[in-house]
Swiss-Prot record:
Gene3D superfamilies the UniProt entry points to: Dihydrodipicolinate Reductase, domain 2, NAD(P)-binding Rossmann-like Domain
SUPFAM superfamilies: Glyceraldehyde-3-phosphate dehydrogenase-like, C-terminal domain, NAD(P)-binding Rossmann-fold domains
Main location: cytoplasm
Upper taxonomic lineage: Bacteria, Pseudomonadati, Campylobacterota, Epsilonproteobacteria, Campylobacterales
Protein name in the entry: 4-hydroxy-tetrahydrodipicolinate reductase
Amino acid sequence: MIKIGIYGAKGRMGKQIEECLKSETQAQISILYDKGGNLGELFEKSDVIIDFSSPSGTHELLNYARTMPKPLVIGTTGLDEKILHLMQSASEVMPIFYATNMSLGVAVLNYLASKASQMLRNFDIEILEMHHRHKKDAPSGTAMTLAQSVAKARNLELEKVRVSGRDGIIGERSKDEIAVMSLRGGDIVGRHMVGFYEDGEFLELNHTATSRATFAKGAIKIAIWLSKQEAKMYSINDFLGI
């Protein structure tokens, strides 16, 4: 049995992973860690660690991991360039999987959106993400991943073409513009839509998550897989083989 440590155990995702691991046949919980816990114990007792914490928590985890390398599955969103660089550096001595969304369906959505962006070059692109009222960051990490993918498919720099809102008399939409809009309300687990619009027709690719168990089960499958991999950075595409 693979021993999985949950980093950020008191959060919504941490609790969901704990619940899903109770019925898992290939893995079990080694330790539940939250802020103020013993990092040394977390690393000593775990074969692999799943992180759904906060940017500061992930930063602390990566710094400690250099002293005791273990496979890390990181699903924390809102990470800045400094943390992403630290993650890349740490992957030289341990396998690290990073994704803004652990859903296999979202991974396929990202793949299809990239292909559609390439094939429908004259179509306008708009992205909408919807989440529960408690989500702290916007746009979601998944929406930004989707935006990066469709921009890259057209050889565009996302920072130069992204729009995060529209208000007032702003003029016509520019050709390369990629809008990323956020909606917050109720208990929506997660919905992402990538739309491609042209005169006379449009295509909308949608993914809706109805339970956090979707992400938790995905993270557990990835953790089991990652425990057998060599040191490097991995993405959801590596896991799916696409």
